[in-house]
Amino acid sequence: MFLLHEYDIFWAFLMISSVIPILAFLISGVLAPIREGPEKLSSYESGIEPMGDAWLQFRIRYYMFALVFVVFDVETVFLYPWAMSFDVLGVSAFIEALIFVLIPIVGSVYAWRKGALEWS
């Protein structure tokens, strides 16, 4: 009753897909020339030498807006398949999707009222 042989193709694929990236890293490490100089160690921004320090600290507001964008973007990705099969799913799926949409909206309203989305 030991059915491990049924997964031979899976194990072969897993081994091959693990060996190829390892070989690529090893071969590039052996063949690539390692030359460090002042030009390679300097920072580079769109073909122009940077003015001032290359490390800037961003305000936390940027991260808040990025986080809100990612939440609603992921929500859109999850809602798209639901919208494509809406006619087949029925009322219970509609209620579940409504709850799924309302949770981030309630969170956004809460953050808005607390002033987390204010730019001042």
Swiss-Prot record:
Its EC number is 7.1.1.-. It is a multi-pass membrane protein. InterPro entries: NAD(P)H_OxRDtase_bac/plastid, NADH_UbQ/plastoQ_OxRdtase_su3, NDAH_ubi_oxred_su3_sf. One of its GO terms (biological process) is photosynthesis, light reaction. Pfam families: Oxidored_q4. Belongs to the complex I subunit 3 family. NDH is composed of at least 16 different subunits, 5 of which are encoded in the nucleus. This is NAD(P)H-quinone oxidoreductase subunit 3, chloroplastic.
